[in-house]
Each structure stands twice: as C-alpha cells, then as structure tokens.
C-alpha cells in the first residue's frame, strides 16, 4: 500500500533526526548510555521469548503495574520485558526484580526490526493507545500477537480516523489480536472503525485497580513534576 510505503520512508528519514534531537536536549542525559536503545540497540542475548509489556510513560506504567504483578504471580517462570518511551516511566520499574526494562525503539523500520529480532517476544501487550505502524507490521511478519489493553478511543478521534478507515485497519487495526477497552463507548468507537466484534472486549479502566497509598501518591506527584521538566 502506497501510504504504508510513504510512512516507512518518512520514519526512516526522521528517526535519526529525532534521536539526535533527544540526545542533545535537556532530557537526553536522563537516558544515560541506554539512549541508543531508541535505535533498537539492545544487548545480544537470549531473552527467553519474553512477554513484552509497553507503557509509554508514568500514567500508563502506574496503570499497568497491577497487571504485570498479577501476570508474574500467575506465570512466575515467564520472562517479562517492559519498555517505556521516557526515563520517568522507566524509573517506576526500577525496583521490580522480575522485569527487565528497555527503552522502546523509535518507530522506524530499521530500529524496530533490530529491536524485535533480538528480543524475539512471544507477545506484545500495549497499554492504552501507543500504536506504531512499523512496529505492528514487523511483529506481524514475525507472527507475534499484539494485544491492546485499557484501550480508549474518543468519539472525536474515531470520527477522524473513520475518514481513513481502510488505511487505519491496514496499518493498525488488522495487526491487533485483541483490544480490551475501558468502556462500552470505547468499544463502540473501535467497532465503527471496522474492528471485528470478536476482537473487542471491555474490562474497565485498569487505573482504578491501582493500590493507592500515601507513598505512591507522593511518588506520582514527584514523577509528574519530572515529566513537566522533560517537556521544557
């Protein structure tokens, strides 16, 4: 498809530019030596066909923590790799001994191919709405199922995507194994875009399952301030 090809070319050209911009920005130092992971450069080793959870930053990570904990309790022998796009999100995984963290690759064909071919995940579980066409296409070529958890889609966004329904499904919708939505409205909005009903279910927001205590509230406020600093 022509739009898919255009997207690949554009992201291949822009990825090095975005990488350099992040590297030399004020927040670049927060990534440390691991900033090269944004280009898919993770260590060469056996990752044991892990289940891969992606949470873009603080909010998604906080919502995913109970799910990841329950997954580990149910399958303690299964290796878990988690990715975030920001250092503040990464910090929330720092004390979880049963997960391995990496920064998610930029959505360029080369970066996602390098990353996924080294990782060899058995499945990818994405929190909320972090959907990248090159990554989804690469995982489809490797027969890796992708699940969207805590999925949300506003009526406004659904109406906008509906104008390119065929393109949306070619680049994104067809690549998803299952979408577990927050609300009935979210489910209906995804269905309007052509997602088959058998791929859709409702769980409610995982963020309501967070075990909130004063320490976590304080931590959340701290990371919220850090996140604002990153954007400046």
Model-predicted regions and their roles:
Residues 2-5, 9, 31, 182, ...:
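Alpha-helical structural motif
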Residues 3-21:
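Membrane-interacting alpha-helical segments
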Residues 208-210, 217-219, 223-226:
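Inter-lobe coupling/hinge segments of SF2-like helicase ATPases
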Residues 1-2, 164:
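Absolute protein N-terminus
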Residues 19-22, 26-40, 44-215:
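Active-site and donor-binding regions of nucleotide-sugar-utilizing enzymes
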Residues 227-232:
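Short, intrinsically disordered, charge-balanced linker/junction segments flanking boundaries
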């Amino acid at each position: 498809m022509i739009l898919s090809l255009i997207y690949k070319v554009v992201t291949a050209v822009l990825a090095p530019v975005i990488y350099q911009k992040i590297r030399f920005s004020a927040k670049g130092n927060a990534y440390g030596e691991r900033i090269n992971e944004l280009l898919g450069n993770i260590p060469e080793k056996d990752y044991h066909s892990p289940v891969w959870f992606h949470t873009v930053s603080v909010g998604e990570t906080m919502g995913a923590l109970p799910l990841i904990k329950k997954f580990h309790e149910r399958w303690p022998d299964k290796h878990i790799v988690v990715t975030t796009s920001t250092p503040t999100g990464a910090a929330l995984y720092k004390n979880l001994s049963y997960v391995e963290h990496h920064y998610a690759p930029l959505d360029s064909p080369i970066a996602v191919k390098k990353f996924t071919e080294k990782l060899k995940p058995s499945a990818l579980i994405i929190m909320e709405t972090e959907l990248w066409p090159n990554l989804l296409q690469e995982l489809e070529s490797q027969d890796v199922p992708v699940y969207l958890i805590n999925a949300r889609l506003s009526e406004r966004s659904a109406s906008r995507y509906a104008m390119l329904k065929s393109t949306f499904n070619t680049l994104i919708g067809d690549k998803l194994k299952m979408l577990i939505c927050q609300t009935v409205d979210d489910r209906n909005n995804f269905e309007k875009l052509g997602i088959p009903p058998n791929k859709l279910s409702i769980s409610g927001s995982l963020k309501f399952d967070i075990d909130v205590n004063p320490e976590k509230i304080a931590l959340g406020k701290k990371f919220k301030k850090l996140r604002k600093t990153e954007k400046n």
